[in-house]
Amino acid sequence: MATFALPFCEIPEDLQLRILSLLTPAEISSFACTSKRFASLCQEDGKIWHVMCDQRWGKKTKIQKWANGQIPYRHLYKTLKGLENLIGFWRLCGRANPAASSPPLVFFDWGSSFILGSRVLSTGDDTYEVKKTPFLLMGISPEGRSENFLDLVGGNLRSVDDDLKELEASNNLVSVDVNFMGNGHIMVEENRCFTNNNRREDQRSSGDESDDLISSPNFSEMYTQLANKTSPGGDRRRQKRKEKERQASRTKWEPEHFLKVADCSPTPTRPLQGLWKGFCEGSIELYLVKYDEVGGIICRKVEDLSLSRYTPPVFWTPKHTFIRSPFSAEEELLLNSRIHISPFAEVHENVVSGMLYMKSSCDLVLPGEPGNGIGFLRGEGRVWLYDNGTFGFGFLRDQFIIDLKRVALEDGCLADEVEACM
């Protein structure tokens, strides 16, 4: 059966736009130079740029809701392209003494008309479950400006409307700037200009009200105030004084730096790479495992990586090639004589398929349990790979194995998350 190819110009316009949406802006500019008809098609913001935004982000966010639909789609495309690098895990860095409101791991994902940053925290209930607490919202104003709001207290960003105007009036949110220091580095700092502008607007509005009182006195109100020994505008002054006291009492938001966790997922050649969570010392601890340049594996606590000072790794292995089972009788005894540390609801039934020798310079002994590593090298231990892709580790000086589970994403949401994704 013979087939015929239609010229591009004879294809229906909606299909033309879908095909063009697969190109880059530079390629579309080149295509627009081929004819006046295509130049006109590529210049219509409501057609080509709308389809390009929908093609790239339509399944992730509601592109018509951004900036209340009042900015050109060409501007929206450029903005979303810059923001999409935020999606994923980031870790706090460079803090000498991080505040309790600044957990070491955060996660950015798409909202309906904004990007939402959430702190990743343990539920604290003896399970592997984690929870996301929104703390940073990034959107666009109808004028096309970036609008970023930080929740210092918590709980104010769980239910957000598409209209960000309501957030500007909230006393529990702080306007911040999110500065990109590179593809994998951002700095969040308070937007003082926004605060000062709002303060000047309040002063102007209160001044206008004072002028009205002077020009149009209400004598009955005046006598009432004299009888109550109050002065005109006293309530407003008290309110302003309370607002100043609230501003003074609020802890200044110190700039914070975040680095993107680039290698947070495993690969066939690097099965342990990424973010992990383990039940240690009565709570969930987060770990970051990386493969180094010399063929070894390094495991660090995410919390330690947020500090400005150097902290030793939890463990490191000189090699990354696993020793496969069956193991020697000595290694089998070493494995089977240990207690698996995991949440109470978890039952360890994993089969060990591989093993690595590891070392560490830090103490990892459970409270109240002295090390029993007499005759062993300090920090020597084992990493055991399970048949389901997870692993556990333990030191020869004690009798425990800390089983780790991956901090994973399922359909863009955190696995083992106790709350519904927003």
UniProtKB/Swiss-Prot annotation:
Q: Which SUPFAM superfamilies does the UniProt record give?
A: F-box domain
The segments labelled Disordered in the record are 197-216, 226-252
Residue ranges constituting the F-box domain according to the UniProt record = 5-52
Task: List the PROSITE patterns hit by this protein, alphabetically.
Answer: FBOX
Output the Pfam families linked to this UniProt entry: F-box-like
Q: Where is the composition biased (Basic and acidic residues)?
A: 197-207, 242-252
Superkingdom:
Eukaryota
Recorded protein name is F-box protein At3g12350
Organism, per UniProt? Arabidopsis thaliana
